[in-house]
UniProtKB/Swiss-Prot annotation:
Complexes and interactors: Monomer.
Family under the similarity heading: Belongs to the EPSP synthase family.
Catalytic activity: 3-phosphoshikimate + phosphoenolpyruvate = 5-O-(1-carboxyvinyl)-3-phosphoshikimate + phosphate
Source organism: Phenylobacterium zucineum (strain HLK1)
Gene Ontology MF term list: 3-phosphoshikimate 1-carboxyvinyltransferase activity
Broad EC category: transferase
Name the UniProt record assigns to this protein: 3-phosphoshikimate 1-carboxyvinyltransferase
Chain positions recorded as 3-phosphoshikimate binding sites: K24, S25, R29, S167, Q169, D319, K346
Record pathway: Metabolic intermediate biosynthesis; chorismate biosynthesis; chorismate from D-erythrose 4-phosphate and phosphoenolpyruvate: step 6/7
Amino acid sequence: MTAAHLTARRAGSLKGTVRAPGDKSISHRALILGALASGLTEVDGLLESDDVRRTAAAMQAFGAGVIRTGEGAWRVEGKGGFAEPGDVIDCGNAGTGVRLIMGAAAGFDLAATFTGDSSLRGRPMNRVLKPLGEMGASWICRAGGRLPLTLKGGSLKRIAYRLPEPSAQVKSAVLLAGLSADGGAEVFEAEATRDHTERMLRGFGAEVDVTEESAGRRIVLPGGQALKGTRIRVPGDPSSAAFPLVAALVTPGSQVTVEGMLLNPLRIGLLETLGDMGADLSVTNVRDEGGETVADVTARHSALEGVETPPERAPSMIDEYPILAVAAAFASGRTVMRGIGEMRVKESDRIALMAAGLAACGVEVEEEPEGMIVTGRGGAVRGGGRITTHGDHRIAMSHLVLGMAAEEPVSVDEPGMIATSFPGFVEMMRGLGADVGADVGGDVGADSPVGA
């Protein structure tokens, strides 16, 4: 089968200033909360990726008015709740979108059927369905809690739910369901996860009480609250900013600045880890935008050293481990990443794919059930891998960054999937001086060292 793919080659230093695309987590929540609210919500800087557009279409299907008024500028006319959709809700590849939407929809007297692409249909939804079921929602789905799934909502009761493992998506789904539940909702998390839902609920006029306890965080959402439309400025996504920043760190002579990057304290695990590795990073122009800390971050080529990442840091950088593994490949010594089993149930088994992809590029890597160990040789990476991504955008972008600094080109298949989170990735990296080219090759997957 002939498949289009992208190839990245070493092309000298990367230099320039860019702005990261809007944060994906906040973009999903802006649309969903805007649809649940009464009145107009205006959003600036929305990430216009396929994932987020799927959520926008879903909000229209649930009865909200959703209009694009300019680049990154959207208006959501909420009706104070969800109406029953007239068709199946296709969430594409958007795992965040479907889980949050199911939580929001569970509180209304409706039936809604959700599906997605082959990747999303293979991802289990049980972690979200369990608390929603305890609140009173019901559903019919495939084995293992997989899509397609029909959710029946309405008449929810209060829940006090302890997260069995860190998950901002599960926490957010419970809180969104709690908006319509009799008595609201309470969530306890032993490890703090990204708190955009709590912050944004307050921005829409809701009361949310967060208490720091010795064993974790308790979030209480009182019942009977109505949301009101508001204005939202979406900051730059740190998960997307990670790619140009790490590319600069591993490419000799490089200096790249990412403007307007979100620095939420629960999203900066990668920056902290890169700092531990000796990365030359500077943070300037720190300011507050819409209740979130935002700044400009500059990365310069650095001689990195291997480190052991604390497992408790995982929730603050769970999406960044693939690109951290690339940084580790160029570092001196061992980088140990443990407590990251969540990576196995993302868009793909990211531990397995990164381990196989790095090995295909000549990097020493050990795969573990809940982690991996990458041993770098101080800047020397052979490259040359032809990578099967299994449709995972972060696997694709991480290996392309590796190819920008490796001795031999690196190719990835299914490049169209990059648009699920970072539609302007290739153009941005080319603007900084990277050599990334699209080709139509032979059977990209069949002879790849990274098989199915």
